[in-house]
């Protein structure tokens, strides 16, 4: 394996000059840079990334923590795509760490990325509380950004959407169109998003003067299968409804398929609304109405 000294000899410069060229630190003439890069290419030299990172205190990496229970959804595929593109545009590499199935495992994933010395970390927490996220941010100097949580003490370190208000808007729109019996398929109720969207549904009904009917509420798990199962549960309960809101587009897709299999026409007999405005939504037949959550 070629060494930096061999590169220096081939380029006719010192090891210090080769180091400056490869690290991008300090002035080196373009002619000298060209000779060094040519020598690197000819020799097949590969710099020691660990040594370079220790010297520059930069790894050119961005860490992302997402629990694997969320990988299956279209929304998270799109999220990962956009994060990867952003990282690529900045000339960096993306490192994905799995938060797995508990707050402790999410902590371990964050620590793993910190140990790798990622320049910055993005976290989409599934189990860690707001207070725990605030504590993690305050105990580390590395830039940490939290998605989909409204932090109490570190507002500049989070990006969040008002999930409750989004659900209220969807239900109020249906009420304005004349719907009174509106079914709701929740997301996982052990997640803040699932709880907030259900709360928005209930508040919209109350504001519209519509009594809450618990028989119209079915718990889902964010997947098309649980969306379809939700429609089947409503059928077995023998409750009527003219509109159905699913807490994400994946469940809405499953619900629409099950309604079709039951011979129910969408939107003529039942209007269906989802959340997240996935790329597939307008290509469905009929097109899926969806709330675009920023």
Label the model's feature ranges:
Residues 1-60:
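N-terminal helix-turn-helix DNA-binding module of bacterial transcription factors
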Residues 42-48, 104, 125-126, 256:
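Short gly/ser/thr-rich secondary-structure transition/capping motifs
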Residues 45-112, 117-119, 202:
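Amphipathic helical "hinge" segments at domain boundaries
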Residues 69, 100-103, 124-129, 250:
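Short beta->alpha connector loops
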Residues 82-93, 108-114, 131, 138-146, ...:
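Bacterial carbohydrate/catabolite-sensing allosteric modules
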